[in-house]
Amino acid sequence: MKTQTIQNTTNGNTAPATIATASDTAPPTTAPKKPKTVTVPELIIDGGSSRTKYYLEKITGSYQSICRKFTKAQELPTGYLGVFKIGDSGYAVGDSALSLSGGDIEEGYANDNKIKLLNVWIVGSLCTHPSFLFKRIKKAGKGNGVIKIDLKIALLSLSSHRKKEIEKAFSNLKFEFDERLFEINVVSYNLYPEGYGAACAAKKHIKESGGKDIRFHVLDLGGGTLTHTPYSNQNGVPRASNQNSVSGAGVVSITEFFAKEASKGDTGGNIYHFSRLKDALESSSVSESGEYSAEIVLGDSTRDLGDRLKSGLEAWSREIIGVRELLRDVRQILRKGERVYLTGGGFKVEAVRAFITNYLGSELVATLPNPDTINITGLD
C-alpha cells in the first residue's frame, strides 16, 4: 500500500507521517463480463423428390425421400437414426423406412408430399444427423422435460411461392426421439429457389476467375427433376428468372431407360434388379476414348453394361420431349457466350456428366465441385 508520512518537527515544519487514502484501500475493479453471444444453429434443407439433403453444424447429410408412417399401437425401435414420433404417429425416414416393416409408405415425389410432409422431412433431417440431437440430450441430462431448441431454417424448393403452406409446417415442430421430447422454435426462415446455393457458388467462381459475365446459367439434374435456371450476375447476389423444370426427368428416369436397354435381347437368363442397375449407374465411368463402363455383379461374375447405359442416356435425351427441348435451349444459350454450370446429384455420376457435357459441346460448360451437395453448402 502506498503511504505518506506527516509529523511535527522542532523547527515548525512538518515531516511525513503514515496515512492511508481511500484509493489505496479500495478493492481492485474488474471489467464487466460481456454476455455470451448465443449462436442459433441454421438448418439448410433441400427437400428433393428423390433425396432430402441437409446441412447443419458443418455436417452435410442426406436420406432417401421416403417415410413410413406407423399407428400408435405399433412399437418402434429406440435410438435408430431417422426414427421418431410426431403426436401419436410414428415415423421412419430414409434407410430406416426401408428396413422396417408395416405402416404406410409415402414417397417425396408422390401426391405433393414435398410440401404436405415438409414437417416430417425437417424432423427427419434432425433425427438422421449424427450428433445434433444427441449433444442436446447429453446437455439436458436425465429427466423427462421437453428439450427446447431454437433453430433457423433455409429451405430450397421449387414450391417457395407456397409460403403459407410452408409456414404451417414450421408452426408445430414437436416430436419424440430416443425417448426424449423435443420442441423446435423456428426463430427465422428463408426460402430460396431450387439451385440457389449452386448459383452462389457459380457467382463466386466467376469472380475468382476474373470474369465479367452479366448472366450465367445453372443446369440442375436431381433425382426427379432436370432444371435450367438463368441468373443475373449483377447487384451483389444472383437473381433467378424464367426457371424451366422438367419433372420426372431426373436420375430415376435415367435409371429406368438404362433398365429398359439392359433388358433388351438375350440376357443369358439374368434378371437385372433395379437397385443393382442403380448401383451400376452410380459407379459408371467413361474412358478417354469415350467408352462407357457400367459393371453389374451377377452371382460370381461381373457384366459390363456400358453400351446399354449409353443407349439408355441417348433414349432419355431423345424420348422425353422436355429434356430434348431443354438441352437444345441450353446449347443455343452457349452459342451466345454465356456460361453454364452443372450441379445436382446426377452430375456426380461420371457417365451422366460426360454424356451431357459432350452433348452440349462447349468449353463454357463447367461442373461445380461436389455437385450433389453444393446446392446446400453454397448457402453457408
PLM regions: where:
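A mobile "lid/hinge" subdomain adjacent to the ATP/sugar-phosphate binding pocket shared
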Residues: 260-312
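An amphipathic alpha-helix signature
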Residues: 252-259
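A structural feature that tracks compact, well-ordered secondary-structure segments
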Residues: 227-231
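Nucleotide/phosphate-binding catalytic cleft detector across ATP-hydrolyzing
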Residues: 1-217, 235-251, 292-339, 347-380
